[in-house]
Amino acid sequence: MRVSRVLKTGAALTGVAAAAGTVAYALSRRPYLREVAPGLRSPVLYLPMHLLADATFARASRFFASIDFSRPIRHAVDITEFSASFDGHAFSARVLTPRGATAGAAASGPRPVVVWTHGGGHLIGGPAMYDPQNARMAAELGAIVVAPRYHKSTQEPFPADHDECYAALRWVQENGDKLGGDTSRIAVAGDSAGGGLAAGLVQRAFDEGHPVRALGLVYPMLDHRTTDKSGAVGQFIWTAGPNRGAWSMYLGDDHLDVDLPPYASPATRSDLSGLP
């Protein structure tokens, strides 16, 4: 009986300590939350991602690198997939095509094309996860969205993903009419790691004489030299530790001490003249 009572008391004290620690942690996060726009505040922002060691998230992500799943869409688009190769690099892509006439195009005739490279820190994600966003983009712009798959850095580091996505872009530039696209109106866009990929693709296409019409960057990973920031910047979700770990996984642990190949870290390009 005495042992049982001691165990119960210990469990109760442990619970109280855990609750007190949780409250203290939540209170410590409030100053950072106040810097976030009210409409963007969420319980998710309390997750202690800022406490992760640099490589923890990057290493753990190898278990999720190949996961891709479609999500419900609310726009009238047709979704297909195809595989091809260009200049010796094989790739596969998801294609979203709007149905009928839209604000951006007639029901028939070539449509503009957006090559969308998805985000995920070069670690996770897939084009199907972006179906809702890409379907909306296709429907509202009257554009065909081509979203290539690519290897994650835990599978193959740079330049594997760059080469796959560049092959997809060049294929679209040369064969986009087979999808109903207007090859004179091609844009490249992406978010997070996909934004960095998009920037590198556009730079390379320009350098090799195949410029595109537009570039869209959504909170892109552009610069491997990113450092810690003050205040609330870098305190939520994609924090400094995972960011450093992701760049190391993508470019190597010595990426801050060596000269990187072109397009690996697009922000290092000094001359942006002529780019969209």
Where are these regions (language model features)?
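N-terminal targeting or regulatory segments adjacent to alpha/beta-hydrolase or S9 domains
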Residues: 1-71
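Alpha/beta-hydrolase superfamily serine-hydrolase fold, recognizing
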Residues: 11-32, 52, 80-82, 89-276
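Short linear interaction segments
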Residues: 66, 84-86
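A domain-start/cap signature at the N-terminus of enzymes
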Residues: 70-82
